């Protein structure tokens, strides 16, 4: 509330987003999608009106979304997407120590790279496509990292 009283409040944006440094809740295993379901909160005088955006997204999408709102080019953020764009491809992707998860409007698929098998396919229908997308994205990430 004290920040709201300052003259800079009208141009201030504060973004809260969680990190994954601590396993919480404790009963959740590392690969479960609910471990990676985190909120992002934008507050401040720069936010013109309250709105809830209920979309699948990644933490990496913060860069493109914020920079686009500021009118700044975000093309160098290869894996970031503007979640406010009308043509935003809605999906979430996460990695854990030995695999990945891919979530879209058709469902959730989690893959174990060491065991070379799916751990979660909900629903089973559509899982093959989700897993192919997840594998392609993971390979693209590794290729990008290897080229840096």
Where do the model's predicted regions map?
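Solvent-exposed soluble domains appended to multi-pass membrane proteins
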Residues: 1-148
């Amino acid at each position: 509330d004290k920040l709201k009283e300052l003259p800079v409040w009208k141009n201030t944006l504060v973004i809260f987003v969680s990190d994954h440094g601590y396993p919480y809740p404790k009963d959740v295993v590392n690969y479960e999608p609910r471990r990676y379901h985190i909120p992002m909160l934008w507050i401040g005088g720069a936010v013109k009106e309250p709105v809830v955006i209920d979309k699948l997204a990644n933490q990496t999408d913060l860069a493109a979304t914020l920079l686009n709102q500021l009118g700044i080019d975000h093309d160098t953020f290869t894996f970031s997407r503007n979640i406010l764009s009308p043509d935003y491809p809605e999906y979430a992707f996460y990695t854990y120590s030995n695999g990945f998860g891919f979530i879209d409007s058709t469902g959730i698929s989690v893959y174990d790279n060491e065991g070379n098998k799916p751990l979660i396919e909900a629903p089973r229908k559509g899982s093959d496509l989700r897993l192919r997308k997840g594998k392609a994205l993971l390979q693209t990430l590794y290729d990008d990292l290897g080229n840096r």
